[in-house]
From Swiss-Prot:
Species for this entry: Scheffersomyces stipitis (strain ATCC 58785 / CBS 6054 / NBRC 10063 / NRRL Y-11545) (Yeast)
The protein, known as: Mediator of RNA polymerase II transcription subunit 18
PANTHER family the UniProt entry points to: MEDIATOR OF RNA POLYMERASE II TRANSCRIPTION SUBUNIT 18, MEDIATOR OF RNA POLYMERASE II TRANSCRIPTION, SUBUNIT 18
Main localization, broad class: nucleus
Gene: SRB5
Subunit structure: Component of the Mediator complex.
Highest taxon of the lineage: Eukaryota
Compartments in which it is found: Nucleus
Keywords: Activator, Coiled coil, Nucleus, Transcription, Transcription regulation
């Protein structure tokens, strides 16, 4: 657990060289540390609804969890050059992290859950508590009961099953009242019910046909990728842990250090679904999340304990000094805390 103090900013692509040169002179780091992280965003697949009782505090909440590891594009990624599509094809690729042919591949994963930043009008910087756990996982292929879509296509919509018990009870009560009041109209009611049942049967047939078509399309697209009934062991681990994958993104950038302050300059990339056949086999085409080639900047300090007021005040002062020193280069600001809220909203 760490207590993180942070400020954020952004710069245009044309200001990247000037910003890097200034930070190199300011920090004394001629060769900044490269950043190449892959983040898998997961969500609890079972909603927990605590029983509310008077006189008891029920602040039990569920959170989205980030699973972070490193990635490589297999070539030198020049951040100084803009990422532009040429003839509809991407020039940025990532190797597949979850592939059916990979066996006994070890990767370091960081599981991260973050609380919403502290609220307040007099906050000088964003302050939030982050819980992390790092593990080394050996990726293998395991058998699964369900043959899901390609493991890298994590942006899937999971439909919830609706309860029909309440509707059936209401229909039964209505039928009883109608039978008591209108005994002479039983024949007409039966005819109407027969028509409704026939319509329902026809609708069910149409739905079954549509489901068969969808399943056949999925098997054609992904059967060669994942194999029948197999998937990556890390995805199986997340499923056993109670989480399902909902999104993914890649980060590429550089990192500077100034005392206890970490300064990161990076771009966010996502999967490019428009490129159906990448130039390089076994790799995924990527595109910028912000096509304007804007760089994101994040400066932060990690405090060991959220109760250490002296270190928190000292870290806040250091961030404010950095903000004042770099005000002519870029403006460091407090991010909106509502966009950093990772709590799962429960629908009542």
């Amino acid at each position: 657990m760490v207590h993180q103090l942070s400020l954020v900013s952004s710069i245009a692509h044309g200001s990247y060289v000037q910003t890097v040169s200034t930070l190199q002179a300011f920090t004394g780091m001629l060769s900044p540390q490269p950043i190449a992280t892959y983040t898998l965003l997961t969500k609890p697949h079972e909603v927990f609804k605590p029983k509310f009782e008077p006189g008891k505090v029920n602040q039990i909440e569920q959170y989205y969890m980030k699973c972070i590891t490193t990635w490589s594009d297999g070539s030198e990624f020049d951040l100084a050059s803009a990422v532009i599509k040429e003839n509809g094809s991407s020039n940025v690729f990532s190797g597949r992290l979850f592939h059916a042919e990979d066996e006994s591949v070890q990767r370091i994963w960081t599981l991260q859950i973050s609380d919403i930043p502290i609220a307040g009008k007099n906050q000088a910087c964003s302050a939030q508590t982050i819980y992390e756990s790092t593990l080394i996982h050996t990726h293998t292929n395991v058998k699964s009961e369900e043959n899901k879509i390609d493991a890298m296509d994590v942006d899937l919509e999971h439909k919830d099953k609706s309860d029909v018990k309440g509707d059936t009870k209401e229909k039964e009560e209505d039928k009883k009242e109608e039978d008591k009041k209108e005994e002479d109209k039983k024949e007409e009611d039966k005819k109407e019910e027969d028509k409704k049942e026939e319509d329902k049967k026809e609708e069910e047939k149409v739905e079954k046909k549509n489901d068969e078509v969808k399943h056949s399309e999925v098997n054609l697209e992904d059967g060669a990728e994942t194999g029948s009934g197999h998937k990556d062991s890390f995805l199986q681990f997340l499923e056993d842990l109670g989480y399902e994958t909902i999104s993914q993104y890649w980060i590429k950038g550089i990192r500077f250090f100034h005392g206890d302050i970490v300064i990161e300059i990076f771009k966010v990339l996502v999967r490019d679904d428009e490129v159906t056949e990448p130039k390089e086999e076994g790799k995924i085409a990527l595109k910028l999340l912000d096509e304007s080639n804007t760089f994101q900047i994040r400066t932060y300090i990690n405090i060991a304990k959220s109760t250490d007021i002296d270190l928190i005040n000292q870290g806040t002062k250091e961030l404010l000094r950095l903000q004042e020193f770099l005000k002519n280069l870029f403006k460091l600001e407090i991010p909106d805390r509502m966009f950093m809220d990772s709590r799962v909203q429960v629908r009542k």
